Regions:
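Charged helix-capping and loop-helix junction motifs
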Residues: 1, 28-35, 78, 119-123, ...
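Short, acidic/polar
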Residues: 1-8, 52-59, 118-128, 175-179
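Glycine-rich, proline-tolerant flexible connector loops at the mouths of alpha/beta enzymes
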Residues: 12-33, 72, 138-150
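Conserved beta-strand positions in the central sheet of alpha/beta enzyme cores
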Residues: 15-19, 46, 69-70, 94, ...
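Conserved anion-binding
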Residues: 61, 65-145
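C-terminal helical cap(s) of enzyme catalytic domains, especially alpha/beta-barrels
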Residues: 80-88, 179-219
Length: 219
């Protein structure tokens, strides 16, 4: 909660709270944590992890989430996307895409924190989830996640050009230039974690760098 408040004070536009171990461990999201964070924050909050059915998403929204992100459950049950969009609205329905580069060409959809390959083509899956009602895509390159080598720009461009909904770039950011490159490559927004957790940059200093690079941001 304190970390969330710190990020808001630094100028974060939105907070994404992902319980990445919830699905592999077969449990639901920690709703008490969501409530505490919601009570402390004024900015939009997206929550994900452990969402296996529409009621799980409903409980997160009741706890204070503005949007709910689904990943593995959307792959095993694609109809869930439409159910979420119908019940709560596309504006609340975020589908996370975890992509791994194929040996040949393109990218394959992976699930369970990158552990399992699905055989699905990422671009085709992106189009399908938008057709089913996803209002936003959270796109992570598992080849870049944690590497601090920058976002996978060709993946970001390919997905952004294939769909009509906002695409948020995730995975690999370590410098302000990485964020600039992602936005120039077609990302509608950028998500960063370790770059802030490590204390190397604040949200404010990154935004100032983005503005100097010609990116419109709210300081």
């Amino acid at each position: 909660v304190e970390l969330s408040m710190s990020y808001e004070a630094q100028g974060a536009d939105e907070l994404v709270l992902l319980d990445v171990s919830a699905t592999p461990e077969g449990r639901s999201h920690q709703h008490d944590t969501v409530r505490q964070v919601r009570e402390a924050l004024g900015i939009p909050l997206t929550c994900g992890g452990g969402v296996r059915e529409a009621d799980d998403a409903g409980r997160l929204l009741e706890a204070g989430a503005d949007k709910v992100s689904v990943n593995t459950a959307a792959v095993t049950n694609p109809g869930l996307i439409g159910e979420l969009a119908k019940r709560y609205g596309s504006q609340c329905t975020v589908v996370a895409i975890d992509a791994a580069r194929r040996d040949g060409e393109g990218w394959e959809l992976v699930v369970r924190s990158g552990k399992d390959r699905t055989g699905k083509d990422v671009i085709e899956w992106a189009r399908e989830i938008v057709d089913r009602g996803a209002g936003e895509i959270l796109l992570t390159s598992w080849d870049r996640d944690g590497t601090r080598s920058g976002y996978e720009l060709d993946l970001l461009t390919a997905v952004s050009e294939a769909v009509t909904v906002p695409v948020i770039a995730s995975g690999g950011a370590a410098t302000p230039q990485h964020l600039v490159e992602a936005l120039q490559a077609g990302g509608d927004a950028v998500l960063a974690a370790s770059i802030f957790h490590d204390g190397e940059y604040t949200v404010q200093t990154l935004k100032e760098e983005l503005r100097r690079a010609g990116v419109e941001v709210r300081l």
